[in-house]
Amino acid sequence: MPNPVRFVYRVDLRSPEEIFEHGFSTLGDVRNFFEHILSTNFGRSYFISTSETPTAAIRFFGSWLREYVPEHPRRAYLYEIRADQHFYNARATGENLLDLMRQRQVVFDSGDREMAQMGIRALRTSFAYQREWFTDGPIAAANVRSAWLVDAVPVEPGHAHHPAGRVVETTRINEPEMHNPHYQELQTQANDQPWLPTPGIATPVHLSIPQAASVADVSEGTSASLSFACPDWSPPSSNGENPLDKCIAEKIDNYNLQSLPQYASSVKELEDTPVYLRGIKTQKTFMLQADPQNNNVFLVEVNPKQKSSFPQTIFFWDVYQRICLKDLTGAQISLSLTAFTTQYAGQLKVHLSVSAVNAVNQKWKMTPQDIAITQFRVSSELLGQTENGLFWNTKSGGSQHDLYVCPLKNPPSDLEELQIIVDECTTHAQFVTMRAASTFFVDVQLGWYWRGYYYTPQLSGWSYQMKTPDGQIFYDLKTSKIFFVQDNQNVFFLHNKLNKQTGYSWDWVEWLKHDMNEDKDENFKWYFSRDDLTIPSVEGLNFRHIRCYADNQQLKVIISGSRWGGWYSTYDKVESNVEDKILVKDGFDRF
């Protein structure tokens, strides 16, 4: 469950005078979560959407783009709102409803269960950028702390990719902050539990599911980036009844829910661009290169005005702030630039590792360093509030140079900061445009904990005494599969062997080679459950029950006897000498 937030944000066209006086009222009385996330009940919902960060709120607003028209400027307001117990996390609510659905505690009409699962998959992937917290009811004026004016400004074609090369618009936040005189400062926070259709649910409840989704934006908010990616709707979307007109998002795109796109068009609409970095003192220019088989990333010095003999390696910056290597081999996994600690305090070395949406050492910030927006500092989120950047060692020999992250204050004398240069000869402006994510893997760090010791699963199906390392076991939010990545990048998927036809109540699990995109075999699909979960009083540890889509079997491990450490699945809920509370990474569900 994501940490409950104290403040949330919403962009709204209504003025501060109106909101400060009356707050946000609901538009209807429909309390249907699936209709809410799929936007099929405009004007009828009892829920009100907010975002966890100003950036997420602005990105959602900014996705409603159109051609810039000076005669008709667009204005709105960004509101900061104090959250309370009526605010619920949308993704956690979706995950909990998936749990209840698999446990048969939510009932549906024929076909609705599959529709609901597809809606939750969209919430996990295409709409995850919204970082939504929604209210079950109106927001009082006393909860609204302040507001900022948000308006649209033109972006010249040279700094924004657009099929027609038009001048288009993006958004900005304007000072000053406007404070609400009716605001009440209280120590409240959002609800730490998921929303339920009926509080204290004890018997199965019925939820109706829409058969269509009205989606204003499936770009993951990429269109509101600094130089945004305007979705190219030419040719028109094959499954849209009313496709968007180029960049003018004044209409709604209506999708049949069965063909709701899992990727934004911006995944493939941007041109590929290599990444060039320049030393701020020596002015040497380097091309960013990669050796994916060895998880290595390095720099080669080039003359940007001459054609390089080195092959171009393509990276892109996605909505999870990852700098991802574009895969050209059809691999099952994706790789991203990852900052790792070294023996030197505060100095990190950059390698490639499997892309994970919850890996803080894969999150990078681009900060423009000049008015023309042609030079960007690249900083790692791993160092928190410490200002940092990318560096290379000026004393390193050879033609390939390692890439480091270091604090800007008092760096070692042999290190020089590198910054991304954006111009026609080097990095294209499209690189600093966030692209929609291509993968949605979560580093789960799967294992178990017993009497002060950590144990990790082995590909043999048994266990080994150690804490599962980062970057080894993942959960795919798109396919619901758990997979193990070896150092040589071989991928094995957790498979449930238990078959109801055998009549047995349990069987071992196994790790198999498998196609990530195969979608029919539910023995490869798993979900994380809180049902009947008793949390041990161990500080900082995160536990879940893990169940298989196929007949809801539960994943367990034997903790005594000759079969110690064996992983298996079972129909039995209560058993002795086993551990059913599976350890997952702290932060597994926070991203």
Curated annotation (Swiss-Prot):
Claim: ATP-binding is one of the keywords in the record: no
GO molecular function: lipid binding; NAD+ poly-ADP-ribosyltransferase activity; nucleotidyltransferase activity; toxin activity
Observed effect of gene inactivation: Among 102 tested antibiotic-resistant transformants, none had a deleted gene.
Annotated Gene Ontology cellular component terms: attachment organelle; cell projection; cell surface; cytoplasm; extracellular region; host cell cytosol; host cell endoplasmic reticulum; plasma membrane
Effect after changing I371S: In strain: S1 / subtype 2, L2, RJL1 and JL
Keyword entries, A-Z: Cell membrane, Cell projection, Cytoplasm, Disulfide bond, Glycosyltransferase, Host cytoplasm, Host endoplasmic reticulum, Lipid-binding, Membrane, NAD, Nucleotidyltransferase, Toxin, Transferase, Virulence
GO biological process: symbiont-mediated activation of host inflammasome-mediated signal transduction; symbiont-mediated perturbation of host vacuole organization
Annotated stretches, region: D3 domain: 440-591
Annotated consequence of substituting D245G: In strain: L2
Impact upon substituting W392R: In strain: RJL1
Location of region: Mono-ADP ribosyltransferase (mART) domain: 1-205
Stimuli inducing this protein: In strain S1 (grown in vitro in SP-4 broth), low expression, higher expression in the presence of mammalian cells. In vitro expressed at low levels in early- and mid-log phase, transcription decreases about 130-fold by stationary phase. In vitro protein levels peak between 24-48 hours then decrease by 60 hours, remaining constant until at least 144 hours (at protein level).
Subcellular compartments: Cell membrane; Cytoplasm; Cell surface; Cell projection, Attachment organelle
Region (NAD(+)-binding pocket): 206-256
UniProt free text on domains: The N-terminus (up to about residue 249) has mART activity, as well as NADase activity. The C-terminal 41 residues are required for internalization by HeLa cells and for vacuolization. The C-terminus (residues 266-591) is required for interaction with annexin A2. Has 3 structural domains, the N-terminal mART domain (mono-ADP ribosyltransferase, residues 1-205), D2 (residues 273-439) and D3 (residues 440-591). mART is joined to D2 by a linker (residues 257-272) which has a disulfide bond.
UniProt subunit comment: Monomer. Binds to host (human) pulmonary surfactant-associated protein A1 (SFTPA1), the major mammalian protein component of pulmonary surfactant. Binds to host (human) surface annexin A2 (ANXA2) on the cell surface; anti-ANXA2 antibodies decrease binding to cells. Interacts with cytosolic host (human) NLRP3, which it ADP-ribosylates in vitro.
Name this protein carries in UniProt: ADP-ribosylating toxin CARDS
Gene: cards
